[in-house]
C-alpha cells in the first residue's frame, strides 16, 4: 500500500513539474507580446502568486487526503488485530493447511473404512464357508495402492493371503493318507 502512495506521489510531482514548465513557457510567450497594463492576467507577479497559491492548495489537499488514508488503514489494522487477539502473527488462517498430511490421512481413513465394510460383507456373506474370497477380490486388492507408498506392504499381505488360501484348499482337498 505504501508503494502505491509512493508511486502516486511521484506522479503528482511529475504532473506538477510539467504544469510549471508549461506556465513558464506561456509566460515567456506572453511577455514577447506586451499586454495592456489594465489586463490583470498580463501581470507576471499576479500569475506567479496565483500559481503558488494553487500549488499550495493542491499540496495541502493531497497531504490531508494521505493523512486520512493512513488513519483509516491504522484503524483497520487495529480492528483486525482485535479480532484475532491471540493469532496476531497468523495472517491467513483459512489458507493454512498441511495438504500432504491431510490428504494422506483422508485417504488412509477412507481405505480403512472400505476395508472394514468389505470384511463385514465377507463375514456376513461367507458364514459357514471355508473358502476364501473370489479371484476378483484378490485382483482388486493387487491393483489397490495406498497414497503414502505402502504398496509393498499391501502386496505382501495379499500374497500371504493367497498362499494361506492355497494351503487350506490343499489341506481340505487331499486325503489324510496322501499327506504323509
From Swiss-Prot:
Post-translational modification: Proglucagon is post-translationally processed in a tissue-specific manner in pancreatic A cells and intestinal L cells. In pancreatic A cells, the major bioactive hormone is glucagon cleaved by PCSK2/PC2. In the intestinal L cells PCSK1/PC1 liberates GLP-1, GLP-2, glicentin and oxyntomodulin. GLP-1 is further N-terminally truncated by post-translational processing in the intestinal L cells resulting in GLP-1(7-37) GLP-1-(7-36)amide. The C-terminal amidation is neither important for the metabolism of GLP-1 nor for its effects on the endocrine pancreas.
Induction field: Glucagon release is stimulated by hypoglycemia and inhibited by hyperglycemia, insulin, and somatostatin. GLP-1 and GLP-2 are induced in response to nutrient ingestion.
Residue positions assigned to the propeptide: 84-89, 131-145
Site (described: Cleavage): 52-53, 83-84, 91-92, 97-98, 130-131, 145-146
SMART domains registered for this protein in UniProt: GLUCA
Alphabetical list of Pfam families matching this protein: Hormone_2
Protein name: Pro-glucagon
Family: Belongs to the glucagon family.
Entry keywords, A to Z: Amidation, Cleavage on pair of basic residues, Hormone, Phosphoprotein, Secreted, Signal
PANTHER family: GLUCAGON, PRO-GLUCAGON
Signal sequence segment: 1-20
Coarse class of the protein's main subcellular location: secreted
GO BP of this protein: adenylate cyclase-activating G protein-coupled receptor signaling pathway; adenylate cyclase-modulating G protein-coupled receptor signaling pathway; cellular response to glucagon stimulus; gluconeogenesis; glucose homeostasis; lactate biosynthetic process; lipid biosynthetic process; negative regulation of apoptotic process
Subcellular location: Secreted
Amino acid at each position: 500500500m505504501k508503494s502505491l502512495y509512493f508511486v502516486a506521489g511521484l506522479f503528482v510531482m511529475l504532473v506538477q513539474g510539467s504544469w510549471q514548465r508549461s506556465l513558464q513557457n506561456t509566460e515567456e510567450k506572453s511577455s514577447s507580446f506586451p499586454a495592456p497594463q489594465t489586463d490583470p492576467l498580463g501581470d507576471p507577479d499576479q500569475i506567479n502568486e496565483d500559481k503558488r497559491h494553487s500549488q499550495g492548495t493542491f499540496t495541502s489537499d493531497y497531504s490531508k487526503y494521505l493523512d486520512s488514508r493512513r488513519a483509516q488503514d491504522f484503524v483497520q489494522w487495529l480492528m483486525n488485530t482485535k479480532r484475532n487477539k491471540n493469532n496476531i502473527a497468523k495472517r491467513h488462517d483459512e489458507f493454512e493447511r498441511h495438504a500432504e498430511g491431510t490428504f494422506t490421512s483422508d485417504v488412509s481413513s477412507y481405505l480403512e473404512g472400505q476395508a472394514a465394510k468389505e470384511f463385514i460383507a465377507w463375514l456376513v456373506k461367507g458364514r459357514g464357508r471355508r473358502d476364501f474370497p473370489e479371484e476378483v477380490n484378490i485382483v482388486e486388492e493387487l491393483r489397490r495402492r495406498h497414497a503414502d507408498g505402502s504398496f509393498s506392504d499391501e502386496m505382501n499381505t495379499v500374497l500371504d493371503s493367497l498362499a494361506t488360501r492355497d494351503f487350506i484348499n490343499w489341506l481340505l482337498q487331499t486325503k489324510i493318507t496322501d499327506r504323509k
